[in-house]
């Protein structure tokens, strides 16, 4: 790395200014191999030691001092290349986030124009209030393509049937009356939030929504309280418009096959590819959710419902931020103290600890679940992976499940659980699906370790946290996990850059305020679709 060249073009060095007037803030320690991501002002080479020391006999005494100091400094840098790269990786990561915020709209007119360009329609009536809230909270303004994708089908249907959105909400409410389906109905009336339902989050959601409910019109919406998505409807299939407008599921949200493998095999769009490109290879046999979902309860009609995760195009749920990703929430996994171990002192291993979740254990199907497979890899490659199941999920042991045998096979002793902060001792952290999404992703990104993530699920932040840029993706069957860890160990600078980028986005972008802005934006779209019913009623 040519760190010296960065110094050479400093105007003060070229002008021969006195040392006391020299500002060393112009000397960032940068890895020029990543200079494409740096500001133009930082893409400058530095003076060599020869340049600094030449003709020192005829120069003022300060040049001799500078020459000596520079030699000592350069020698120190040469002995600590990892520290230098950490500085440049941190800078590049910070700069990428700075650029993200710099390109956001700064006026309502600009934001509205970009919204229209992306969606083909004018912003919803309450968009100005959302914009003011987002600016106050320093949120992203233009980066909500995930929301636009989730709602597009409903806007398409509204062209032909403007009251259909409201009708399906009413239909769901009637169907759910008296059923323990883990679905809550939320009502906003004059800015106050009330909730009816039977989910674990009914005490949390009203507090979250109340942070912005005063800006929303009176409305009702539905939230799925299960980790699993619920709307098993492929709106990308031929004939989807007609099927959506003619619902026929007589028991919505009550389809609960055990196991679920045959149900998904027969559902349109639910044969999930292991990779986005290349020859089609199904992941259905490698996902605990698709094999034997822990708590199924689906509908095969298209209903509007907010959910924490989904698989596209198998499911058509509308994504929103789960409480697991609010730092202020009890549900969020917290570390008791920040990372206090230098990167160089961390082990070149990938770390994971967790429960035996993944799907309902029926016979020996658990061998295909990601968490059990991860422990198998750890046993065969202890030089790369340190993974253990620390707690057995009793509720997922169904008929045909031999609890004692499973615990013995995977040495699940349920002894004292290891502190979450043990992760700090490892350079790499593994994130794998449990019942659905793990809920750990943001915490792992903030931990100081490089995250290797394997999942079949989509979440609301997927457009902001991208594979190969902020984390290292791993196939659902974990067949490339060892290869990816080896790559990280053999390319420490590139791995460190990915780690720093993920850390920076998780800390600065996906914050509680940003989650509120996302949730608020979702409900602004929901309110717009409800407004179509009112407009149709007045015409």
Question: Can you annotate each of these PLM segments?
Answer:
Residues 2-85:
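N-terminal signal-anchor transmembrane helix specifying type II single-pass membrane topology
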Residues 12, 44, 108, 336, ...:
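Short linear sequence motifs
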Residues 35-36, 40, 46-52, 112-115, ...:
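Broad hydrophobic/π-residue packing in well-ordered secondary structure
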Residues 54, 170, 339, 490-493, ...:
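Polar/charged alpha-helical tracts
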Residues 59-63, 67-76, 82-412, 417-419, ...:
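Secretory-pathway glycan-assembly enzymes, especially type II membrane glycosyltransferases
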Residues 417-539:
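Catalytic binding pocket for nucleotide-activated donors in carbohydrate/polymer assembly enzymes
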